[in-house]
Structures are given as C-alpha cells and as structure tokens.
Amino acid sequence: MSEHSFAFAYTVFFMVSVATMSELSSRRYELTQSEKRVIPTRHSTMKSCPWVVFHTRATLTRSFPCLCSNLNPSTTSCLAIFSEHSYVVVF
C-alpha cells in the first residue's frame, strides 16, 4: 500500500469516526430529576450494577445490561445499552 493510499484511508476512517461520535453525542438525552426512572438490572459484565438510570422518552421494553466502574465512593458510572445506541449516565 502506498503512502498516499494509506493517508487517504486513514483520513476517511477519521472522518467517519468523528461523524459517528457526533451523531451519538447529539442523540444523548439530558437527564433531569423529574425525567428519571430507575430500573434494576440482573446482568453486569464488570461488577455489581444494581441500577440503570434512563430517560423516560427512550423506548425501553426490558432491562438492559450495563457496565459499571466506581469513580469514587459516591459516584458510579454506568454504560447502559439502549437499542443500538449507548448512553453514559452518571448518578
């Protein structure tokens, strides 16, 4: 592969990555206290994750698995899977 082809391929990959991240960011909902619902989860891949906070406007029909990591004793970060998109919720 020539240097020109590699540079072009890398540029295209970078542009697609940025576009995808922008789309996911624009789809992320802002949570307010009145719009939160809490649902218990049975599945966790990293450690015990008893709660997932999600936006009530999101269409959810069942519990979703989440990834949790303790940032500090009072804050837990959960990555909850909502259909094909991921939302990071800190509570």
From Swiss-Prot:
Entry keywords, A to Z: DNA-binding, Transcription, Transcription regulation
GO MF annotations, alphabetized: DNA binding
Top-level lineage group: Eukaryota
Purpose: Possible role in gene regulation during soybean nodule differentiation.
Anything else known: Binds to a regulatory sequence in leghemoglobin C3 gene.
UniProt protein name: DNA-binding protein DRP90
Record organism: Glycine max
Lineage: Eukaryota, Viridiplantae, Streptophyta, Embryophyta, Tracheophyta
